Structure formats: C-alpha cells, structure tokens
C-alpha cells in the first residue's frame, strides 16, 4: 500500500523481494501482482511484468481492484509471484485474511512465490498469532516458507513462501472446500498479557 511505502513505515518492501528473487524464479517467469507503487519494478522490466493493484487506487497506473473479488476462473494458476506487502494487516476480518492466502495459492502456479510483509507486532506481539502458527496456516493452504527476515525491535517481518505442488485434496483445501484443523479456524490464545488481537483464520 502507499502508506506502507513511507520511510516511517519501513520503506519499499520491493527491495527485499528483488534481493530474494534471483535463483528462486526463472527470468522468464517474472510476472508479479501485488499492492505497490506503479514504478517499483521499472528497472526490472526486462524480466518482470508487474500489475500493481490497490483497493482504492491513487494513481492511473495502479488498477483499482479488491483482491478478494478477483475472478478465480480466469486467474487460477496464472501468476508467478504475488506480493502482499502490508496488505493482510489492513484486511478488517481475520477470516478474510485467510481467504486472501487461499486465493493467493489458487492464483499462483505450482512453485510460484508469495511475498508477505506484516508489521512485526502482528507476529511477535499478537494474542492469536506467532510465527509457528503463521507457518501452520501457510502450510495448510499449500505454502512452504523459504525465506524470512526481521530485526529484533524492528518494524516489519518479511516472509517469502513457495507454492507447493497440490494433490487433488490439496487443491480443494486452498479453495476452502476441505476442513482445516480447528486451531486454524477459530481464535486460540497463544500468549497472555498486554497483546494485540491480530489473527488470521481459515
């Protein structure tokens, strides 16, 4: 989002994504979609074709689009990279955050990449989410974590995930047609004390 691009929020996350991509994604498979500034990837047009979207676009080159309303039939298995940079934390409902992750897996090709950026307190100081639970949620919808970065006392956590090959039952899972473990579908307290209430539910 444009707010998250500010230096007071941690700066442009595309720098981390571009640092990680070489060696993980063939140059011919550089298409990405995410919520970014329109010129974030201009220097990399030789191998990246990106389509920036935002719920309320403030720039003519950013498509105004609700990620949760993207047509599944025409986009399933069509994307190589999806960047959800400071996006999940702006989705109001915990279950819609889970739906966004399921849709991301639906839209990605097998072995595609999902880049997630969250405010660090969403993972380190949440009553309902820690890194282990985030890993479980991602695995349940078909992702494995390949890279993670954060600084102790920092503002953000960066997570890069690989879309794993799905079985027939797994293909139903990321579409929400198969039951998930109960600890991933309802809020379960993981920490006590003064915490925030950020959660992701499937």
What spans do the regions from the language model cover?
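Class I S-adenosyl-L-methionine
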Residues: 124-202
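Class I SAM-dependent methyltransferase Rossmann-like catalytic core
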Residues: 1-26, 198
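Catalytic phosphate/metal-binding cores of nucleic-acid and nucleotide-processing enzymes, i.e., regions
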Residues: 86
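Eukaryotic short linear interaction motifs
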Residues: 35-39, 58-61, 90-91, 122-126, ...
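Adenosine-cofactor binding site in Rossmann-like domains, unifying the SAM/SAH pocket
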Residues: 35-79, 83, 92-95
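A short glycine-rich, Lys/Arg-flanked "PGG" loop and its adjoining helix->strand segment in the class I
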Residues: 95-113
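Conserved SAM-binding loop of SAM-dependent methyltransferases across substrates and taxa
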Residues: 14-26, 34-47
């Amino acid at each position: 989002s444009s707010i998250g691009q500010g230096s007071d929020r941690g700066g442009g996350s595309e720098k981390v994504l571009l640092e990680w991509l070489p060696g993980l994604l063939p140059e011919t498979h550089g298409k990405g979609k995410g919520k970014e500034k329109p010129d974030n990837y201009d220097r990399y047009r030789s191998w990246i074709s990106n389509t920036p979207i935002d719920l309320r676009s403030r720039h003519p080159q950013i498509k105004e689009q609700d990620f949760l309303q993207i047509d599944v039939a025409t986009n399933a298995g069509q994307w190589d990279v999806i960047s959800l940079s400071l996006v999940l934390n702006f989705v109001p409902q915990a279950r819609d955050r889970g739906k966004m992750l399921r849709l991301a897996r639906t839209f990605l090709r097998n072995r595609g990449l999902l880049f997630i950026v969250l405010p660090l307190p969403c993972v380190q100081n949440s009553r309902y989410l820690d890194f282990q639970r985030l890993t479980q949620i991602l695995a349940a919808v078909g992702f494995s974590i390949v890279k993670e970065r954060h600084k102790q006392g920092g503002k953000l956590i960066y997570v890069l995930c690989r879309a794993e090959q799905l079985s027939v039952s797994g293909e139903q899972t990321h579409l929400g047609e198969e039951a998930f473990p109960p600890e991933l579908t309802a809020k379960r307290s993981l920490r006590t004390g003064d915490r925030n209430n950020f959660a992701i539910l499937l």
